[in-house]
Amino acid sequence: MLENSTLFADIILPLALPRLFTYRVPRHLENQIVELQRVIVPFGKSKRYSGIVHKLHHQAPGDREARYIEDVLDEEPTINAEQLQFWEWLATYYMCSLGEVMNATLPSGMKLSSETVIRALEIGEQDNEPELTDREQLILDALKVAGELSLKDVSDIAGIKTVFPILRGMMEKRLVVSDEEIKDVFKRKTEVYIHLSEEFKEEGALNVLLNQLSKAPKQEELLLAFMSSTNGFNEKMESVSRKELLKRSGAKSTVLLQMLKKGIFIAESRAISRLGGNAATSESVSLSEAQTRALEDIRLGFSQNKVVLLHGLTGSGKTEIYMQLIRDALDRGEQVLYMLPEIALTSQIINRLRVQFGRKVQVYHSRFSENERMEVWQAVAKQSSEGSLIVGARSSLFLPFRNLGLIMVDEEHDPSYKQNDPAPRYQGRDAAIYMSGLYNTHILLGTATPSVESYFHAMSGKYHYVRLAERFGGAMLPEILIADLKEDTKKQKMKGIFSPMLLKTLSETTAKEKQSILFRNRRGFAPMLECNKCHWVPHCVQCDISLTYHKSVHQLKCHYCGYSMNVPSKCGECESTDMRMKGFGTEKIEEELSSLIPELRIARMDLDTTRSKYGHHKLIEDFQEQRIDVLIGTQMISKGLDFDHVQLVAVLSADSMLNYPDFRAYERSFQLLSQVSGRAGRRKEPGLAIIQTWKPEHPVLEWVKNHDYDGFYENEIGEREKFGYPPFTRLINLSLRHESNLELDDAADKLGNYLRRTFGSRILGPEYPPVSRVRNLFQKNILVKIEAKASLKKVKDELNKQISRFFSEFPLKGYRLVIDVDPYN
């Protein structure tokens, strides 16, 4: 670097901005700053943010005077080069900014801004009593009075412009936390250890002490237990954890406290890892002939550097194959990412993996605290053995892998892999495929019901295809019966929402001490409350959707924005008190079934009952141990769960999913119904699945009944080709949003017509979606269809250009445009 040349840095800020911003590096930071590091920069009139150094260079910005970087937050790069490439691909492919990707990717503890609020830690939350500088004491005194302060307030109080270095030091001393941390304070987990005071470590002094304690037998016993725990008298007399010492001695904590006060023992707090798990307790699993053939075929696909699609029946033993592939990668010293679509799946699979791989297995998903996620992040970045096998939802893609050898995407067909809000609106499976190329690693997609796109790529030779066509251990596929609700209703045989076939089979299943699963893709008690006189229905005040009744809290709730209200005693239109519940959800199923068969032990598994960190784990454990006879659930019970004693699975209403206005409706219905049915009879006894419907002749139900994926696919791919839908086209959805539907109509029509000048018949709409207003914003969609052979990059570049021109020519106020590439909804 030339001595007189000025160093500049392009910074990624965690904001939805279309470009990077260039800052000047002050001389005193030139030897500290490196690319991909976090820095503090000013932005706007008074705000400050932590950003990532994208690039260092000597080119001054031509449009403005560059402002100075204020501080460097890390000694080393925060992210690695592969992560940056991955960020850039996400931003380009999904048409969003690098700042939006950064905001979604980094744990909240790594993001600071001038809007961050600081508060003091309570006494007892602090690890010790550190020495304070005058400024630190000044800030703490102010916090004790105010409770919390913005960074601007702290700056004014301390009398300095840049407060980040001081606050960083105070955070390290455990004096203060930021608002991101208040939700889940990021601090090392600690455990108290006890060691003997130095003055008693000589044998003579220790004997004198033992004689003195003969008059205090409980303290004497505790000292002897300590010596036993540290292998008797020796020069080191190493420490023992407080928890273990009290357990071994049987002493009460008050006895230990007395000895601490006397100075016999000294207590110290030590940081320990949150990354749990025991050592591995089992060797590798043995595979059947069919599994062994599939494993060898997968390895063949890996040797050809292809994406591998494993198409295995429900209950065919895909997980055992996954575990062998994991073992191969770990034996090579590589990191492994095992992706699952649903948090509910993790507890069961984690238990199986930890038996095989012990502490190497770690979990990364949103239900875990910021503390735990940060420790997993750090373990992955350091290539620690604790964290060499990561099990997680789609966000686990963003971890700082350095030696990634294998990615497995289980249930690859699942729509939960798609991020809807906020940006980047990425598809986890597709992002994983790109990432496998970036890291030059193997990738396996596994499912019993492949997505139409993945199967198409497998049949065309783009992916390597492996079929596992028999269930593990000789288990038979479940028999699937269709219950005709129209006929049963006509003959007045229905008992509420239950067909006679289902009730009879439920009773028989329980009598045999077997278990049942009931599926309904709607939580809550009833879909809606309706006036029996004028048919008025309470709607959300912010969304164009009826409110769902939740009996447990006796409230009506919106599942889009969270709005809730008390149940009205009379109609909001005609004031009639004749209000009726229409439809049914998981709560109502539970209540009705309890009244029909009171002896059943019933539990629900939906978002309402699994909100806590371990809510789903407790339910799965209780069901596994047969403390529950019937498990009622939403779609989370359809995905990969494996129970020994489930003989009956029932779908209470198949019609709502079959009738959904979306080109993927048949695909989703076939996948969901097949997956739910596959939970039954996964051991030697055959299972039974019952699907209740008003349309028993529906072709999707026939394919499901006959376990006929090929028949479903041939029909579906023909329809997609005929009407121009993926995989024969690519889709981009433009959602224009505004508070006024009248203004939105006008603006959306203008935008649609403007884009047709360039894209012609490839532009469809604008149209209102089924739910046309969410969170007080009306929305209209414009769909862009792109031929599969066309350059998607060129189309997106041109689309961005035309959208920018449109908003330049028509400067609309109060509008929001959301772009969704490869939309699922």
Which residues are covered by each model-predicted region?
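Accessory, non-ATPase domains that flank or precede helicase/AAA+ motor cores in DNA-metabolism machines
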Residues: 1-447, 461-475, 758, 792-825
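A short, contiguous, amphipathic alpha-helix enriched in charged residues
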Residues: 8, 33, 743-756
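Solvent-exposed residues in well-ordered beta-strands and their adjoining turns
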Residues: 14, 26, 737-739, 785-787
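Solvent-exposed, membrane-proximal periplasmic/extracellular interface segments of envelope transport
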Residues: 57-66, 70-76, 672, 769, ...
